C-alpha cells in the first residue's frame, strides 16, 4: 500500500508509517492541518515552562522520531467542551498517543474520558486510525494510584497504566 510520497507497511493488520506518510496523514486531517512538528517539538512547545516535563518522553534514537502533534491544542476550537487527548508522536513508524497528566486516583475518570474521546475521534481518521498505536499516560508528578484500587483495575481494563516516563524504542 503506497501513499503519494511515503510508504505504509502492514504489520499484524496495523500500518506503520514513514516520516512523509505520517506528516501527510496529519496534514490531511482538517483540525490538525498545520499542527505537525518535527521530532518531539509539539511536546517541547508545551513543556517550555516545565523543565521536568521535557524528560518525560525520550527517544532511544532521535533519527527515528518522525514527528509529533499537540492534539489538544489543534482540536480545541472544534471540540471546546470535550476531554481531549494531549499528543501523538510517530516513532519508527508506530504512533504513541501520550497524555501528560497528574496520576492520582481522582484523575482516573478524567483520563479515561480523554482516552474514550481519542478512540472515538480516531475512528474516521483513516491512516492515523489504522496505524499501529499505543496509549500512554505519563504522570506529571509521580504515580499516586494504589495498584489494587478500583481505579487501577479500571485502567487495566482499558490497557492504560500511568508511567513516570516513556522511552520510545525500548
PLM regions: where:
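Acidic-basic catalytic patches of nuclease active cores, encompassing PD-(D/E)XK
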Residues: 2-79
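Domain-level recognition of nuclease-like catalytic cores that cleave nucleotide substrates
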Residues: 5-6, 11, 15, 19-29, ...
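A glycine-rich, hydrophobic loop/mini-helix early in the fold
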Residues: 73-92
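Short acidic, S/G/P-rich loop/turn micro-motifs used as interaction or catalytic elements
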Residues: 76, 103-107, 143-146
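Conserved catalytic cores of phosphodiester-cleaving nucleases, focusing on short active-site segments
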Residues: 87-89, 93-104
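Mg2+/Mn2+-dependent nuclease catalytic core
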Residues: 104-117, 121
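Arginine/glycine-rich "motif VI" loop of SF2 helicases in the C-terminal RecA-like domain
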Residues: 120-131
Amino acid at each position: 500500500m503506497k501513499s503519494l510520497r511515503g510508504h505504509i507497511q502492514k504489520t499484524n493488520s496495523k500500518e506503520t508509517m514513514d516520516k512523509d506518510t505520517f506528516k501527510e496523514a496529519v496534514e490531511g486531517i482538517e483540525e490538525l492541518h498545520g499542527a505537525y512538528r518535527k521530532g518531539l517539538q509539539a511536546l517541547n512547545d508545551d513543556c517550555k515552562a516545565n523543565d521536568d516535563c521535557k524528560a518525560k518522553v525520550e527517544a532511544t534514537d532521535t533519527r527515528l522520531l518522525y514527528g509529533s502533534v499537540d492534539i489538544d491544542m489543534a482540536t480545541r476550537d472544534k471540540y471546546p467542551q470535550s476531554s481531549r487527548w494531549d499528543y501523538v508522536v510517530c516513532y519508527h513508524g508506530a504512533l504513541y498517543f501520550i497524555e501528560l497528566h497528574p496520576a492520582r486516583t481522582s484523575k482516573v475518570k478524567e483520563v479515561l474520558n480523554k482516552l474514550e474521546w481519542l478512540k472515538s475521534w480516531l475512528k474516521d481518521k483513516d491512516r492515523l486510525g489504522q496505524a499501529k498505536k499505543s496509549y500512554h499516560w505519563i504522570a506529571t508528578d509521580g504515580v499516586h494510584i494504589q495498584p489494587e484500587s478500583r481505579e487501577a483495575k479500571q485502567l487495566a481494563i482499558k490497557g492504560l497504566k500511568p508511567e513516570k516516563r516513556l522511552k520510545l524504542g525500548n
